[in-house]
């Protein structure tokens, strides 16, 4: 009788990928990157082990939103003080904090717990085209579709 393969955390080989966000739709990019971070693109995927790869996203300031979401989509945060609910439109967030916009979308698609926090540390997002991870020799990842 055969048993199901279970990956061990210390046996996982991790790659580095570069994804160019220029002209990409926010949600479609985020779902594919979340899948790579979890390791779902590997045959050795194990749900309770971090088997994913590192992802570097460049040109976050050039991400695309469909429809009228730039003006209609709101991002909320709270200061933890009474009456401290703050809100920003997607246009303001993309203009002033483009990295935060992508990180929020991707982290929302990851598990909520210890594994999700561990997986999200492998995400590196940069507003421009430059990144400081050349020493890791990242591969260019072509998105589907």
Swiss-Prot record:
Gene3D superfamilies: Ribosomal protein L13. GO terms for molecular function: mRNA binding; structural constituent of ribosome. Keywords: Ribonucleoprotein, Ribosomal protein. GO terms for cellular component: cytosolic large ribosomal subunit. InterPro entries: Ribosomal_uL13 (IPR005822), Ribosomal_uL13_bac-type (IPR005823), Ribosomal_uL13_CS (IPR023563), Ribosomal_uL13_sf (IPR036899). GO terms for biological process: negative regulation of translation; translation. Pfam families: Ribosomal_L13 (PF00572). Transmembrane segments: none annotated. The keyword Protein transport does not apply. Part of the 50S ribosomal subunit. This protein is one of the early assembly proteins of the 50S ribosomal subunit, although it is not seen to bind rRNA by itself. It is important during the early stages of 50S assembly. PANTHER family: LARGE RIBOSOMAL SUBUNIT PROTEIN UL13M (PTHR11545:SF2), RIBOSOMAL PROTEIN L13 (PTHR11545). HAMAP family: Ribosomal_uL13. Belongs to the universal ribosomal protein uL13 family. This is Large ribosomal subunit protein uL13.
């Amino acid at each position: 009788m055969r048993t199901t393969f279970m990956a061990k955390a210390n046996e996982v080989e991790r790659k580095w990928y570069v994804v160019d966000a220029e002209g990409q739709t926010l949600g479609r990019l985020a779902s594919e990157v979340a899948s790579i971070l979890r390791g779902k693109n590997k045959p050795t995927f194990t749900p309770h082990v971090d088997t994913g790869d590192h992802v570097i996203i460049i040109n976050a300031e050039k991400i695309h939103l469909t429809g009228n979401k730039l003006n209609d989509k709101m991002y909320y945060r709270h200061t933890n003080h009474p009456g401290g609910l703050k809100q920003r439109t997607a246009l303001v967030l993309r203009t002033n904090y483009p990295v935060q916009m992508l990180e929020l979308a991707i982290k929302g698609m990851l598990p909520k717990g210890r594994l999700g926090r561990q997986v999200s540390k492998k995400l590196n997002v940069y507003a421009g085209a430059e990144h400081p991870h050349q020493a890791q020799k990242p591969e260019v990842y072509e998105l589907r579709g």
